[in-house]
Each structure stands twice: as C-alpha cells, then as structure tokens.
Amino acid sequence: MKITDIKLTGVSFGALDKPFWNSIVRTTTSGGGRVEIHTDEGVVGMAPSGASAVRRAHILGAIKTKLVGEDPLRIGHLWERMYMGGTRKPVAKGEYITSMSAVDNALWDLKGKALGQPVWKLAGGVRNRVTAYAAGGYYEEGKGIPEMCEELSGYAASGFR
C-alpha cells in the first residue's frame, strides 16, 4: 500500500465575538478542518485539523512531499521523515509540529482501517484513568490580572494541578 494523496478540507465559522490571544498568536476567527490521507488501495485515513493558511501550507507542501509514495503503515518512519528537516529549522516547531500531529492521527486512522483494528488496540490497549488538564489563561479585551487569577484558581479548585 502506498500514499497517493493528502488533502485538507476546511470550514470557517467566521469572526469570534470575543477574540483571545496568548503570548504568540491572536485568535479572531473560528473554524476547523479535516486532513485525509489517500492510498492506492482505496483506504483513507482521516483526522481533525485546523485549516489555517499556515497549516494548509505545511500539510499540502512539505509534509505531503515527504509522504506521497510511502507505505502508510510505517508510521514511525513517516513521523521521522516529517519531523527532521521541517520547513525552516533542523527539527519541527510551532505550527509545523501541529500540522504533523493531524497527519500522524490520520495515519493511525488509516492503519486501523487497513488492519481492521481499532486505533486504541494498535496503541497498546486501554487505561482506566487518563490525566486531564485545563487549557486556559488566554488574554481577552477587558480581562486583567484579577480575572486571570480567578479563572486559573477555578481550575485548581476543580482538581486540576
């Protein structure tokens, strides 16, 4: 089996009522996407992905070039091909590694379909407990230090460490 194509479809939900940002990027719109990995045997792996212009360029550019023609079941090998020699540095960083994550998830979906196995089984089984984390602390217009402290204290009060 060989990878023949990688596609990325996206959808935009428009502008956010309340944009937010972290130390790196400001988020003003909402949307999402799906990466699809197609093979010569008709098996297609899919996974959710953002569909920003940067992510689109990474997935349909450098990553696609490295994976088309390869065996999709060799996920470790393909991960190394994607990781080494990202777009501008010796190793992957930032949006590039986020793009890799979507492709990696689609490869696992493809492998599960090809082998007739659920991905959880391919990944080694199940666990009775999973450590969760709270993502927050984003900046917003009108949100100051007191509001940030209140938000983060709420996560701690809910049991997040």
Predicted feature locations:
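Structured beta-strand/loop patches that form or line metal/cofactor-binding pockets in enzymes
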Residues: 1-46
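Metal- or metallocofactor-binding catalytic centers and their adjacent structured scaffolds
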Residues: 5, 38-114
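N-terminal small/glycine-rich loop or linker at the start of catalytic domains
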Residues: 41, 115-141
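Structured loop/turn residues at beta-strand edges in well-structured enzyme cores
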Residues: 1, 101, 158
